[in-house]
């Protein structure tokens, strides 16, 4: 098989710490989206591991949480359990997408955490895809750059608000500007946990993993970002109340928790943290970049990730940035309806591009030079 062999449509995988998105590059949307989690067998009652093999993946693992130990193979954007991640990939190829990985180039997005501190993970991923799944070609792409690429950009600022990882990443001509790369302390999990604390103040106990998954759904269904917290708090209580039907049939009423919860994105001090809030982090990241880039970064801010879906978040961030940005740098936020899937969509678009063939590492090159060649691609 020569390097010029024409393969089937590339498989695109965005392995988020919480959710994995996968599909073929010629599709408009990810063909499969499922929890990036595995279940391992446990001995009921003693909580001891009997067999370390992965028994189930994704929603099936969550559904069997009473009888299995749940583990995330990817944590904060970094693969920490390669055996479990291989099981997730097998599930992706053979059960979720029904494809033969040896017939498709495979494109995987990469978290900025890997870019900055864990680059050897890229070699491990490359070996896994070639040796275990016999991929004909492999490409590893920056998820931040792919988020921009989905919007037709190669330079801009990516604000990614995920469940396990949130960051601000300046990108110039497809490459992360390391000086401005900033990881945010508040992420989706911390916001969910904060909401559970607020509910506890009202006598509602949600502390188990199953209960926290319910709190997460409450957060995603009812919470929003207030444009002005003081004014929102002064409103009539009835005007901000909303109800949520619990699985047991009871009705949960939320009041100011709806906007107090995501406020930690802008004010991490609510959690006792001294890290900068979202607006400060964006401004600081841009100002750490070359002055010649700053206006372009302010003008091309792409917001992505599940946490970006809070109603009111983009409007609040736009307003606060306009108050902080230099007069010669108009602020423009791109908040697409499909922003949760931007890294996947950008990678799919890139895989359809003519330049992809020169970017992907072929099996022949891998066998001649090894996995280290992935750094040159």
UniProtKB/Swiss-Prot annotation:
InterPro entries: Actin (IPR004000), ATPase_NBD (IPR043129). Induction: Constitutively expressed. SUPFAM superfamilies: Actin-like ATPase domain. May be a dominant-negative inhibitor of eukaryotic actin polymerization. Belongs to the actin family. This is Bacterial actin-related protein. The lineage of its organism: Bacteria, Pseudomonadati, Myxococcota, Polyangia, Haliangiales. The gene is barP.
């Amino acid at each position: 098989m020569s390097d010029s062999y024409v393969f089937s449509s590339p498989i695109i995988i965005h392995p988020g710490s919480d959710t994995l998105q996968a599909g073929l590059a010629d599709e408009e949307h990810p063909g499969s989206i499922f929890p990036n989690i595995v279940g391992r067998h446990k001995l009921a009652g003693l909580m001891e591991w009997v067999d370390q093999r992965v028994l189930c993946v994704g929603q099936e693992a969550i559904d069997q949480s009473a009888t299995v130990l749940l583990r995330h193979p990817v944590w904060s954007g970094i693969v920490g359990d390669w055996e479990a991640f291989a099981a997730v990939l097998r599930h992706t190829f053979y059960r979720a997408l029904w494809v033969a990985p040896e017939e498709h180039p495979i494109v995987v997005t990469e978290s900025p955490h890997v870019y900055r501190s864990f680059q050897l993970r890229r070699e491990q991923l490359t070996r896994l895809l070639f040796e275990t799944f016999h991929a004909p070609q492999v490409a590893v792409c920056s998820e931040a750059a792919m988020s921009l690429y989905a919007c037709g950009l190669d330079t801009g600022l990516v604000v990614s608000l995920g469940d396990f990882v949130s960051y601000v990443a300046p990108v110039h001509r497809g490459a992360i500007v390391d000086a401005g790369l900033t990881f945010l302390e508040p992420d989706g999990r911390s916001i969910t946990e904060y909401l559970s604390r607020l509910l506890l103040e009202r006598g509602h106990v949600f502390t188990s993993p199953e209960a926290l998954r319910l709190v997460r759904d409450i957060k995603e269904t009812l919470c929003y970002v207030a444009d002005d917290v003081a004014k929102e708090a002064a409103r009539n209580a009835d005007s901000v109340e909303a109800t949520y039907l619990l699985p047991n049939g009871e009705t949960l009423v939320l009041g100011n928790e709806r906007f107090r919860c995501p406020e930690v994105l802008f004010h991490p001090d609510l959690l006792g943290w001294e890290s900068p809030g979202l607006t400060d982090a964006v401004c600081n990241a841009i100002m750490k970049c070359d002055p010649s880039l700053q206006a372009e970064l302010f003008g091309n801010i792409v917001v992505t990730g599940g946490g970006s879906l809070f109603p009111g978040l983009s409007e609040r961030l736009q307003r606060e940035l306009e108050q902080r940005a230099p007069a010669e740098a108009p602020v423009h936020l791109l908040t697409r309806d499909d922003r949760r899937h931007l890294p996947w969509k950008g990678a799919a678009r890139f895989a359809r591009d003519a330049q992809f063939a020169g970017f992907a590492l072929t099996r022949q090159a891998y066998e001649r030079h090894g996995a280290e060649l992935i750094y040159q691609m």
